[in-house]
């Protein structure tokens, strides 16, 4: 199978997994709905398909989750920045830990800071930023760690192709 076709197919499967898992596991925290599975899928995308297909996955997943009522507009900056940084870090260092760290930094820190202008536009009290910040940190950490342990298990059993991404 052509590499682009493989990546597109895998991205579609990961989008479907994300939508299904987001229906099952959701943690409402203030004005956001936290989905650790989004971060889990983001790390898998960073490793298996790279930053650009991962970015498409995050965008499409966020749109679909909003349409189905299982997401919020805060999903866009967090998931998209997180997977992009995770994919770039994985491509540079080829270590699963860097993909997980990239997701955590991209979503937990940078993505949460990017919600400030959205909060202003949506007329949400900026005093609620800190709970949102901590929710982003905690959920991106949880999802990233789940993906890290799964990928390390696959790597130990020689089921992870090192040429991914």
Go through each PLM region and give its residues:
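Loop-helix junctions at membrane interfaces
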Residues: 1-165
């Amino acid at each position: 199978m052509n590499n682009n076709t493989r990546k597109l197919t895998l991205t579609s499967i990961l989008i479907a997994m994300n939508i299904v898992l987001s229906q099952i596991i959701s943690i409402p925290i203030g004005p956001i709905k936290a989905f650790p599975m989004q971060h889990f899928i983001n790390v898998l995308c960073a490793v298996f398909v790279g930053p650009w297909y991962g970015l498409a996955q995050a965008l499409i997943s966020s749109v679909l989750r909003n349409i189905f009522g299982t997401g919020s507009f805060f999903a866009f900056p967090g998931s998209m920045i997180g997977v992009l940084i995770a994919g770039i870090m994985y491509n540079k260092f080829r270590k699963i830990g860097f993909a997980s760290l990239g997701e955590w930094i991209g979503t937990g820190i940078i993505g949460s800071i990017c919600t400030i202008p959205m909060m202003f536009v949506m007329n949400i009290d900026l005093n609620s930023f800190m709970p949102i910040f901590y929710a982003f940190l905690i959920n991106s950490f949880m999802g990233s760690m789940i993906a890290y342990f799964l990928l390390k298990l696959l790597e130990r059993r020689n089921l992870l192709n090192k040429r991914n991404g």
